[in-house]
């Protein structure tokens, strides 16, 4: 008997427009009727994972940000693996010479150190979240903008950092540098 089903969101549970199809909603409700539960496993932040679930009238525990945080049915943080300030600073140092946009996923949502013009240009070139569900305004509203020095003054818990650039060559160089940081999954 199936007791638990773990489901990814992007490319699995969600349609390309970012919504859960009625067919998938029925399937998940059918699981519950059979006595099974489901949980979400995603690279998304908790806030970004919760939105399509709420819209579909579904509730589930969420393993988010590639396992960095686990939330229960009621949205309470059950477990977390934080990046240390040292790791975050090393990541910033590794990327210093590149024109990078960062998505710092934290306990208080997503932060970026990008200037708004750079952020918009990246979005318009479909480098930043190239999914149909997102408009520029919708993406912009999901981020808080901060100067690099402010990030540590805010007392944020860092869970995941996405490094965004349109060049695979640049990303390859950065990946090589980041892989040298101890206790960091790249």
Where are these regions (language model features)?
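Active-site phosphate-binding/coordination module
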Residues: 22-129
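A short alpha-helix capping/helix-coil boundary motif
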Residues: 5-8, 28-30, 68-72, 152-155, ...
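Short, small/polar residue-rich loop motifs at catalytic or cofactor-binding pockets
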Residues: 1-2, 64
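Conserved acidic, metal-coordinating active-site core of Asp-based
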Residues: 94, 98, 105-186
